[in-house]
Amino acid sequence: MNTSIPYQQSPYSPRGGSNVIQCYRCGDTCKGEVVRVHNNHFHIRCFTCQVCGCGLAQSGFFFKNQEYICTQDYQQLYGTRCDSCRDFITGEVISALGRTYHPKCFVCSLCRKPFPIGDKVTFSGKECVCQTCSQSMTSSKPIKIRGPSHCAGCKEEIKHGQSLLALDKQWHVSCFKCQTCSVILTGEYISKDGVPYCESDYHSQFGIKCETCDRYISGRVLEAGGKHYHPTCARCVRCHQMFTEGEEMYLTGSEVWHPICKQAARAEKKLKHRRTSETSISPPGSSIGSPNRVICAKVDNEILNYKDLAALPKVKSIYEVQRPDLISYEPHSRYTSDEMLERCGYGESLGTLSPYSQDIYENLDLRQRRASSPGYIDSPTYSRQGMSPTFSRSPHYYRSGPESGRSSPYHSQLDVRSSTPTSYQAPKHFHIPAGESNIYRKPPIYKRHGDLSTATKSKTSEDISQASKYSPAYSPDPYYASESEYWTYHGSPKVPRARRFSSGGEEEDFDRSMHKLQSGIGRLILKEEMKARSSSYADPWTPPRSSTSSREALHTTGYEMSFNGSPRSHYLADSDPLISKSASLPAYRRNGLHRTPSADLFHYDSMNAVNWGMREYKIYPYELLLVTTRGRNRLPKDVDRTRLERHLSQEEFYQVFGMTISEFERLALWKRNELKKQARLF
């Protein structure tokens, strides 16, 4: 018997848009509340009994011969009666030798006690007797025959010769025959209703066949679900073991299962389906958009996160590899070449890695942050979480501060060595390079130089930066700095890189690096660096290679920014001895930021398009951006359907999500998607 509960068809169901759900009974389209039974849908008014027409949506029903029938009609048509009380049986049923009983009616005919599980049952005509009562009925004393004896077969008196005692009656030896074929029974026989039969005739007329071997069963029989088996033929399809007396068994079609084996098979089927589906790559129990969702790929015997693979530069050699194989994930770990990068545990420090390994880690982390965060820009003053950078306002005074205030959500924070001796303990950060020499990355040293020549060369840029902070009518005292100019410096997530190349052996260094790196991804990254260096020298927008022009180009690294009300800063390249000593610096152009040597300052506003990934988003009312089914509300043509929330004004954004845009962007991706679904903007 089955039950069904009506449910509301969701208007946001993915099936509602393309596949129309039709009623199984009338064929019309289902709208509103419907009933689903065996993958068939019905209107509530159409889901009725096939016999009497009563509603089945709120009651039990039976499915027989492709018809849905109520309980009463099913019992009248196909119901089973108890052999003891003659009532219809619903629920549990006990079958024995073709007879069915209620569990409460299947008791011993003599002692009226229920049969113990696994106990033997003796049938005597229409009575069933337990094993204890059957032993008391059996007597070892011979049957006393009083008076003349008559044959039960020919009804004549037995006078001379031998007589046969069978079925509690006396027979002539020649009269004890099979009722069907009249063969004299001298050996085993089977009786039914007091009439003897030979074994073959009894099986042909009343016999029971085994479902497994298709042979007749004589002796002990095992019955389950209306099917009969030899005790040795009923075996579990999984473990191939026999069933003991009284043991529970599951019947699926023609297969018999132990309860434990059936549960194990269901678990394996679910696990196999999970591994073969797309969600097998994600952690168990996670939902789509969860931060723990990890999809990995295998390229050239290396395991890469799909974000890392998608964020790699579009080099021809990368896209010539075969399609990545989907593999199972291992959370909180990253793999590169065995010779270059070892598996970093939570307690290991990056200071133990080689400079080449650090550079590969930094490139992979940078590309991963670019691909995962749309508002991130590769600049010394932008943070991945969109936090406001704080710099020293004055170009004449620098105070050393923490190198980074970010923390990685998937890695524990590691100890780093401070570049300058100070009593202040810098916050721990996974991406800080080692304290040893590294030609691919040098952290800037924020302090004033004592070198007079360096200060003279940067005087012009400093005056311009200093004058830009005051009105034209005001001339500040050069020996006095206002209180607002002293801001504690917090390092940016991406410190400027200073590359120092030797005059004669820079190409040889790259060749040696290429030979050392056996990792395919590491070799591709170094090839990209060499290609960028060679193209930067031939770039017509890059100044000639001279000490003067390189210093002029490096002046463009000074920034004047105002991000969420944070103080502006001026960082001049001449104040850093590591950068001022370099011969030239290749020009990097990423995310569309092409900075020319004449652009000394880069203005950033928290309200401009940079916050939304360098794209202008036209503002629309919230009602025009709602996502509905079947195209009832058509979206404007120029909107970004994957970023509908970015077309809202600040006031409507706060009314819809209850938070500002910057707070919304700091949320995890899965959390943002959930909020957008609730607001019908997803």
Curated annotation (Swiss-Prot):
Name the residue ranges with Polar residues bias: 380-393, 405-425, 453-466
Pfam families tied to this protein: AbLIM_anchor, LIM, VHP
Q: N-acetylmethionine: which positions carry it?
A: M1
Q: Which Gene3D superfamilies does this UniProt record tie to the protein? A: Cysteine Rich Protein, Villin headpiece domain
The HP domain extends over 614-682
Domain named LIM zinc-binding is located at 21-80, 80-140, 149-208, 208-268
This protein's source sits in the domain of life called Eukaryota
Molecular functions (GO terms): actin binding; metal ion binding
Q: Where is this region: Disordered?
A: 372-426, 440-475
Q: Which UniProt keywords apply?
A: Acetylation, Cytoplasm, LIM domain, Metal-binding, Methylation, Phosphoprotein, Repeat, Zinc
Which residues in this protein are found as Phosphothreonine? T542
Summarize subunit and interaction data from the UniProt record for this chain.
Directly interacts with F-actin and ABRA.
Q: What is this protein called?
A: Actin-binding LIM protein 3
Source organism (scientific name)? Mus musculus
